[in-house]
Regions:
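A general structural signal marking secondary-structure boundaries and capping sites
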Residues: 35, 60-64, 128
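Short, solvent-exposed alpha-helical surface patches in well-structured domains
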Residues: 27-30, 39, 55, 119
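Acyl-donor (CoA/ACP) binding surface of acyl/acetyltransferases
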Residues: 2-25, 33, 70, 74-182
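Conserved GNAT-fold acetyl-CoA-binding loop/helix
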Residues: 36-58
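Surface-exposed charged/polar residues within alpha-helices that form helix-capping/stabilizing sites
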Residues: 30, 59-62, 122
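A short helix-loop-beta-strand connector motif used in the catalytic cores of GNAT acetyltransferases and
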Residues: 58-72
């Protein structure tokens, strides 16, 4: 991966994280209306018409929330394959929750999710001053748990929401410092 993606935020071994753009809307809508992907997110598929979704999407791009940041995930060829975000940003506690979606199934179980998580965590901890990044993953989603563990996350608790059981995992900034040799 030697070319620079437009709006590049961070680069991993397999993926580039970049700013979201309006041209992502068709992919994002397709993924948000996909029943299987919604199940992995403990959500219902988005039911609104594309034009309504597009209006909301434009607003999010024009007026981003200070409590969340959404990024596109690209592969080495520059194809938009998913999204990464951090949200529930708490500047006082110096932490944020993360989430990723690989919407293109041909990239599942091939290291792209792990690389996206590692790249996102490294970016957050190096640029924000946060001390902790955490996530919640469904207790039955073994593939996601494996990717998060390979990325350095450790289980720190459990939670329940909307009839779903979640495993809470965390990554501490001090761990990144240890990986870099102090």
């Amino acid at each position: 991966m030697t070319t620079t993606a437009q709006g590049e935020v961070a680069r991993g071994e397999l993926v580039v994280l970049r700013e979201k753009r309006l041209s992502d809307a068709p992919d994002d809508y397709r993924w948000r209306t996909d029943a299987e992907l919604a199940r992995f997110d403990a959500a219902r598929p988005f039911a609104a018409a594309y034009q309504d979704y597009l209006a909301l999407y434009r607003d999010e791009l024009a007026y981003p929330s200070p409590y969340r940041r959404s990024l596109g995930i690209e592969n080495a060829d520059g194809a938009h394959i998913g999204n990464a975000m951090y949200y529930n940003i708490d500047a006082i506690r110096r932490e944020a929750e993360i989430g990723i979606t690989l919407g293109e199934r041909e990239f599942w179980s091939r290291g792209y999710g792990t690389d996206a998580v590692k790249t996102l965590v490294r970016h957050i901890l190096r640029t924000t001053g946060f001390r902790r990044v955490y996530l919640k993953t469904l207790d039955w989603n073994a593939r996601a748990q494996k990717a998060f563990e390979k990325s350095g996350f450790r289980i720190c608790g459990r939670s329940r929401r909307g009839g779903n059981n979640f495993i809470v995992m965390e990554y501490m900034a001090a761990w990144l410092d240890l990986q870099r040799g102090g």
